[in-house]
């Protein structure tokens, strides 16, 4: 028995490597062999000797006490008992010491032949089926054909029992007695033993050479891919030279994990609870021992083979029970948990124990509001504090000499004697606590507070801290943690104190914004009322105004004039006569710092956020906190003074409601009449009805809003709550006193988009709903609650993936020195600005110098931060776009650099080295994800679609410019002549008549009617174009007669007739017969073809066969999907889809080149579209005929233009327009989803995630590098490898050289030396060629793929697919350098960010004297050297 070495791992390691375990290593780490399946003796409850819990192998069960009891107590430490062989030591060694089981026959490791990719199979070139047949003793495999090679038997051939016996019969007699090494001997075996022989005889270098040759020269793509797959496995073994041998994938010795990690616990009633692993180990041992016996008694081969197979299966179950088809089950039919299962999943070792540990010194309780707390304080119940600070109190008790021993001090604390409260007060000063509310969605979910002792049992929380925690006081609970060490206390105070975290890291806006009551109070006090008492008085200063108010001479809302301090235009504080203000506003301004000026506005939640922002900028965080406490107190006080509750009478129903509803009903009747007469289709009727009610509803809302706003000069309580932003939304008020409106229809699960019920709910909540109305609306309410529950999980999972992909992005250097950047412009949608240039460049770093275009003044130098003032200056200048540094173009090798990241939004200063920007980005994106999903049910399933806007109207006086416009002339319903647009790419630009600046650009849809011409100068409000919002149309461009082709009833079209109207409609359906393609030809009178139009699936044909049509007539209407109620339920999956870089379900076909369109033939239900560029390059695309084709013959398209309807896939954008375009696309698309919900998140967070998605490249041509074709490698690694071979030479012919072989890569210098030596001896010199670098293509990975592809295997394994990741890592002999957060948390190290940065580890802080002494010495040395 090989004895183990003492291996104590130091905790200051800097990397972890993983590899296959060799049998020698397993023995080295083992403390002895487990020979018996027994666990413990049923009578004595002591472990059996040589069993699974044996004390001799694993160590004693009790501290310092051997099995037989001969040696007890610590003084015998280290002695091995002579009677029972147990070493006397502490019992915790039973958590560390391993044992082993020596198997009689080798078995294959299930990870390497059962999981895909099949490693052993790839190495040997055997398919999984055949490999299974060998491993499970069903077939023999030929290991060495020997003399049988002539009979056509080759290595790796599989033989059945009969074939094997036949061969043995025909073998020459002496063949069996030859040595195994003799090449003539025939050898065939079965089981893992055979695999072992095959693997150990592999020549990896030769195999690698052969496969490389195959991969580069094979004509068949399939064989080429096969070769590349095998090559990857071969290369992994070659790369981890010596550390991994292929034959180690076959297990000869099974390690047994320490007994404490698979415990056996006695329950009451004489039964035991045991870990599943013990069962699995027991089966292995029993089968192994039985096999030993069978071999000893020379049992027949059949029996042995069966037993060997059972042993293989037992070991399989032990390693990975979930992978087997017939998993081992318990009596209760539950599969046993194997070693792999204990690592996997949420309950596995990684996520349960290594990444989520429980913490001592913690408490939890319900929270209540603490309105009199200051910022950064919280109230902790007395009893809780005494328990939390116990060790500190004990220490103080002993220090003060009140007690002598710790034990008696404990008693005093437990009895809560009065003396401890005084000590507790003292101990708590300057010792903050951390408060945490679950779910902790972002870093503000844990903050530090200075505790105050309070009576009661609930924790008091500062009301302004609620937003960050997303807490309310309806029974939420919070956990308290106590930082113990001095470092921890310091970090809590400096970095985590609530008063220091008043900005939201997601967008830089203040997060400590008063809400609800406070806002209402401030709004009320700053509101003006005409005709109030004391109106028009003038006061010489705030004091006088307050005296007048207190004496009751002037009302708090009265409009008065006061002399106050305000800022002049240079920003100096001066006295100003403020007209039109009120006493309330004076009171508020007493709290506002003078540096901000005088606020003479009404305060709502929105304006309050800006005010707080300004205060922080003007006077810094410390004084901003005082200001916040001031307005908190004032707000609460005024909400109470104003008595701002509302009653039923405050909910006003506008008189106009009846009129509007009547109008709506009349319009709907008219629509029904049109339908019954057959003027419109059922679909159009439905759309128009929905449209009518949507309009009625929005008109009613406007009137209602005006009514309530004018009630009591706007002092209506309901209106004040709404207008101040304290509570409620326009939607809710509309439902209370307008009408509930349209509701969504109950939908089957998985159906796309909600339909809308066309009968609206005309009542509101004040009038009360009828039974039917109530029933309709319950659906929405319930759906909301169900969605919430389901979506929370999705949002949480999104956050987890985001963190996993970006946790290693840390600011690692000041400046990476890149010259690249992103061009940033204001984001516009048509002509409304979504994000201004100011917002997008603020806090970023400029790439180049920015100079004012007219004055030539330098605004900001390259490499400098764009501050608020600079951004404003750029915004005001005519500059349209700015090139800024971005993490997308950062060239740091690890993490990103400070200049590319820009400003840290949580502190408004440039980001510091060591900031964990990746995790912050992930939290900023994930946190609102949960919020968004929780926001569905408030509208109660109300159909939230706006009335379709289907026209272009001039918003200013401007000149029109059309581009790519193709039209035909026709007449509209009124018989007026109009032009109809028939080009797909038409755009109209509105140009300012005076300056020539483009005001806005609009896309003019196909089928629009034009009411203006190119170059017209139009007035504001003029209609330019309008189109049918409900139907996409196909319009004929030629005049002639219709001729249908392949339009066959019930094959390519179906007829829908309407019972109500008796109207028949032809609707094109998808045909089973792909040769039949429905189309409409336009022919002349004499039958010559002019144009052909395809009829897309789902189109309603509105012309008859043989009908005469003129240019501009509609042939087909394709109903647009309308009435889809938008919900973030669509939003969250969209975000996931973008971050996972998934292709949409119906992708558009996109042109890859600029060129002209020609329509080709129809092939198998696809229409061929040919794009020919000006250079003569031709690309052909096949578009499914069920799709609508967006281009027409002779159109000129740009690269990236969609040819058919559908979404463009990110992969297409990357391939056609390049990486920058796809990065911008993903960032903007995700931003759109969040913007729709009114969530502001800074672009840089999305950029970090997208950067992580674009880390990898795929090798196209490996050249002379070590890469393989199609291999996916890190961009950084790729560049380094190319740099490595740059300028080197590859030997083509080694000539007479002894040192160099063909194919070897050498430096030019080595080559020169070698050749000059050969020349001197008149020998043939070496011939070389230049080394060829690899080429690659940038790829876009989804966040899951990117997280699994990280360089750290520990991070990947703790994320998903644990076994697969570890499996790959082991074969590659990977080394984890512990650069990210997760790896370090798993190892129990400080994270390499913030105060845990690695360079801080080596810093030694000495005393001031020492420093002075060193300086003095240095000065002496310098002086001395000068003298010399």
UniProtKB/Swiss-Prot annotation:
What EC number(s) does the entry state?
A: 2.7.7.6
Q: Which cofactor does it need?
A: Mg(2+); Zn(2+)
| One of the protein's GO biological processes | DNA-templated transcription
SUPFAM superfamilies for this protein: beta and beta-prime subunits of DNA dependent RNA-polymerase
Pfam families from the UniProt entry: RNA_pol_Rpb1_1, RNA_pol_Rpb1_2, RNA_pol_Rpb1_3, RNA_pol_Rpb1_4, RNA_pol_Rpb1_5
Q: Which InterPro entries match?
A: DNA-dir_RpoC_beta_prime (IPR045867), DNA-dir_RpoC_beta_prime_bact (IPR012754), RNA_pol_asu (IPR000722), RNA_pol_N (IPR006592), RNA_pol_Rpb1_1 (IPR007080), RNA_pol_Rpb1_3 (IPR007066), RNA_pol_Rpb1_3_sf (IPR042102), RNA_pol_Rpb1_4 (IPR007083)
Record flagged with keyword Transferase? yes
Q: Would you indicate the residue range of the signal peptide?
A: none
Q: How is the cofactor bound?
A: Binds 1 Mg(2+) ion per subunit. Binds 2 Zn(2+) ions per subunit.
**Known catalytic reactions:** RNA(n) + a ribonucleoside 5'-triphosphate = RNA(n+1) + diphosphate
Name the Gene3D superfamilies on file.
1.10.132.30, 1.10.150.390, 1.10.1790.20, 1.10.40.90, 2.40.40.20, 2.40.50.100, RNA polymerase II, clamp domain, RNA polymerase Rpb1, domain 3
Binding residues annotated for Zn(2+) 1, in chain numbering = 66, 68, 81, 84
The answer on whether this UniProt entry bears the keyword Ligase reads no
Positions bound to Mg(2+) = 472, 474, 476
Q: Which UniProt keywords apply?
A: DNA-directed RNA polymerase, Magnesium, Metal-binding, Nucleotidyltransferase, Transcription, Transferase, Zinc
List, alphabetically, the GO terms of the cellular component aspect.
Answer: DNA-directed RNA polymerase complex
One example of the protein's molecular function in GO is: DNA-directed RNA polymerase activity
The entry's Zn(2+) 2-binding residues are 816, 890, 897, 900
Q: Which family does it belong to?
A: Belongs to the RNA polymerase beta' chain family.
Assembly, per entry: The RNAP catalytic core consists of 2 alpha, 1 beta, 1 beta' and 1 omega subunit. When a sigma factor is associated with the core the holoenzyme is formed, which can initiate transcription.
Q: What does this protein do?
A: DNA-dependent RNA polymerase catalyzes the transcription of DNA into RNA using the four ribonucleoside triphosphates as substrates.
Protein name, per record: DNA-directed RNA polymerase subunit beta'
Q: What is the lineage of its organism?
A: Bacteria, Pseudomonadati, Bacteroidota, Bacteroidia, Bacteroidales
Gene behind this protein: rpoC
